[in-house]
Design a protein with these regions (language model features):
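Extracytoplasmic/periplasmic proteins that interact with beta-lactams or build/remodel peptidoglycan
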Residues: 1-159, 173-210
Length: 211
């Protein structure tokens, strides 16, 4: 074999080796990350296959789940006083994924956390549907409402954060202008367009100003 052909053969061999190593990396190292990625359809289906757990403020749920007619997305997220609490909860959208508490505690809210394994086994034996777990916040409903009302009455673009000086617990987390996570919680093109419209607004309602 002459020298140019030998160089080409070596190059092709190295290229094949690199591709094999990359495929092996994806299969064995990145498998878990890819399996849990938000763009993975299976992840999205599982997230909305059962009622999500609630996010709790002052002993009351400020989120919920509503049954749909979709086979793939059996439930969609609902919000109570959505604009006031959006800087706390974030959103859980069938088309846009999750943010803030909805993302941080997604495995708990969707019931996929390993700590629920025993409960899921019990539910299967008793014929109960799988349930998500609740997330209890330190937010004080009165403080949150006062901060939100103060900013909206002024028509201001700003933020309010209130902390307990003794413990550091977050009592209020307000950002205005805000948005209602429920209006784009579904998978429809119309709801996706609503999210896009919010992204394009000059006053940036999706921005979480306290953070």
């Amino acid at each position: 074999m002459n020298r140019p052909l030998r160089h080409i053969a070596i190059f092709c061999g190295l290229l094949v080796l690199a591709l094999l190593l990359r495929a092996n990396w994806l299969q064995h190292v990145d498998r878990q990350e890819l399996a849990q990625h938000e763009r993975n359809a299976r992840v999205r289906f599982e997230r909305f296959s059962t009622p999500r757990g609630d996010i709790i403020v002052g002993g009351k749920a400020i989120t919920g789940s509503k049954e749909t007619e979709s086979r793939d997305y059996a439930f969609r997220r609902t919000s109570k006083e959505g604009p006031m609490y959006a800087p706390v909860t974030g959103y859980a959208s069938q088309s846009r994924g999750t943010s803030l508490l909805e993302r941080t505690y997604d495995s708990v809210l969707s019931g996929q956390d390993d700590r629920f394994a025993f409960r899921h086994a019990k539910d299967i034996l008793t014929g109960q549907p799988r349930r998500g777990g609740d997330v209890i916040t330190t937010i004080d409903a009165k403080a949150q409402k006062a901060g939100y009302k103060g900013l909206t009455d002024l028509g201001a673009r700003g933020a309010v954060v209130a902390l307990d000086p003794r413990t550091g617990k977050v009592l209020a987390l307000v950002s205005t202008p805000s948005y209602n996570p429920e209006v784009f919680a579904g998978i429809s093109f119309k709801e996706s367009d609503r999210f896009t419209a919010l992204e394009k607004k000059k006053d940036k309602p999706l921005a979480n100003r306290p953070l």
